[in-house]
UniProtKB/Swiss-Prot annotation:
Keywords: Decarboxylase, Lyase, Pyrimidine biosynthesis. CDD domains: OMP_decarboxylase_like. This is Orotidine 5'-phosphate decarboxylase. The keyword Disulfide bond does not apply.
Amino acid sequence: MSSASYLQRAEAHPSPVASKLLKLMHEKKTNLCASLDVTTTSELLKLVDTLGPYICLLKTHVDILSDFSFENTVKPLKEMAAKHNFLIFEDRKFADIGNTVKLQYTSGVYKIAEWADITNAHGVTGQGIVTGLKQGAEETTNEPRGLLMLAELSSKGSLAHGEYTKGTVDIAKSDKDFVIGFIAQKDMGGRDEGFDWLIMTPGVGLDDKGDALGQQYRTVDEVFSTGTDIIIVGRGLFAKGRDPKTEGERYRKAGWDAYLKRIGN
């Protein structure tokens, strides 16, 4: 795992979007990604405005919004990202052949490539998925875009481990500029070959150990000790009975302290 600071990594990173993210993490002293699975735009925007000061990244699932529109959802989200200085990660989990994912990324109702700084994909269909998504990004926008590969998941019984994970890492090696890292539970190596992958870890909780649908939680210190760079937190920030502002600062501080401990500060 990396013992370099976020700023050191930002200055040397080959990906413009990864460099931008690492830099704002350093500036805001946060490695918290808020995963906000709500079903209306008003709920989403309210939570984003409250949590914005504490996060480096917002993770969305726009296909669960019952009232999604560019004018009323994407435009204010982008304005809040500028106001609070965070990036947007649409958790689309693409998993088809290259031409199909390119169309899913650029077209349809959501036109993800136009507004999401980062998206992600499964490795199950092979290297073509990276090529297709990169082409889609290049043909849609001049803004920097990045892709995360799903190497490991936090759900009980996940098949994403062992040879599957190794194969996904091999796919990531095909594009140093566009593939910026992984959704994973631990460090994925690569530094000896010149890669500096960002590791983003879901299933992080300071209080809960799991849920009835197979989610398994690990503590902030645990995930940083095995190589994470960014913690993805959802219900821990806004579930019933929790104050998003209080929890946002609590997770921000826990993540930042764990990062400082790892780099020896």
